[in-house]
């Protein structure tokens, strides 16, 4: 079974955000000649925000990191997953969206104490 990076996404506009996120991930997928390498779930709405998950095939991210080389390594974060979230955040900037990303594994850790 393929390994996946699960990213919690918080956004104020689900339709617009999920569409843009799909375009950005689709472009990344095309870059590495991938197919069906990501899934964006439906959202749950609470407190004025939509919460959903973007699940990305780790192999796609690894290929992208290899293709980008040092440019990928310069992204903020320790490890492949965090650097990918930084890259994704950068690619989503300037699209007039209120959006936040967090690795699902981090959100579920006891470090945060509320999940």
Annotated model-derived regions:
Residues 1, 112-115:
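Short intrinsically disordered terminal tails
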Residues 1-7:
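Short structural boundary motif marking the start of a folded domain
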Residues 4, 51, 98:
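Broad gene-expression machinery/nucleic-acid interaction feature
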Residues 7-16, 53-60:
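Short beta-strand-to-loop capping motifs
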Residues 10-38:
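Short amphipathic alpha-helix segments
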Residues 19-28, 62-85:
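Extended Gly/Ser/Thr-rich low-complexity repeat segments
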Residues 33-74:
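Short, intrinsically disordered low-complexity segments
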Residues 71-112:
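Conserved short beta-strand edge segments in small beta-sheet-based binding/regulatory domains
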């Amino acid at each position: 079974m393929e390994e996946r990076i699960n990213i919690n996404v918080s956004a104020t506009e689900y339709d617009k955000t999920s569409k843009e996120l799909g375009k950005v991930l689709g472009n990344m997928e095309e870059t590495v000649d991938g197919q069906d390498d990501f899934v964006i779930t439906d959202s749950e709405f609470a407190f004025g925000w939509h919460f959903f998950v973007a699940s990305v095939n780790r192999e796609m991210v690894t290929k992208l990191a290899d293709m980008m080389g040092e440019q990928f390594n310069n992204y903020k974060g320790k490890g492949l997953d965090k650097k990918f979230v930084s890259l994704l955040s950068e690619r989503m900037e300037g699209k007039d969206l209120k959006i936040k990303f967090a690795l699902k594994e981090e959100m579920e850790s006891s470090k945060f104490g509320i999940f």
